[in-house]
Amino acid sequence: MAGSGQERARHWRYPELPGVDLLRARFVEKIFVRHTHENFVIAAISDGVEVFHHGGADQYAGPGALALVNPDTPHTGRAGVPEGWRYGAVYPSPELVAEIAAETTTIRGTPGFVSPVLDDPYAAGLVHEVLRAAEEGNALAADTLLRVAVTRLLRLNGGPLPQRGVHT
């Protein structure tokens, strides 16, 4: 990977994609301690390998794969190779994913991802295209590509999430 050793991240919001955070990053030594996100994580790996602890086991995502984390799901993150990993990610809100699922899939209930890693270079490319469209200010392309990507991921690797009880 070119420029090995340099860590960088750009996190932003594109006003024309409400409810979605965007990220481009490259990490070598960064270690993410156990944490959660309110939104979904859809991270497309470009180079290197990301290892993340999820569901009681280490998961490995390399080039062309996606790391997929449902909201409020504890996970970690670190490099799986000395060169680190480079990725682009979208963080759509649960409400947006539910809207897309209702319009484009047969999933009933709260939609989510079944497996935390999916090897799908086409879907990974769609995530990178969403980021590119947002950077270029192309709202129609960014929204369309995001919806196509989420639809594809839900059709290939989606299902209803288990109901969570209310704790008092």
Language model features by range: what are they?
Residues 8-109:
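N-terminal regulatory/effector-sensing and dimerization cores
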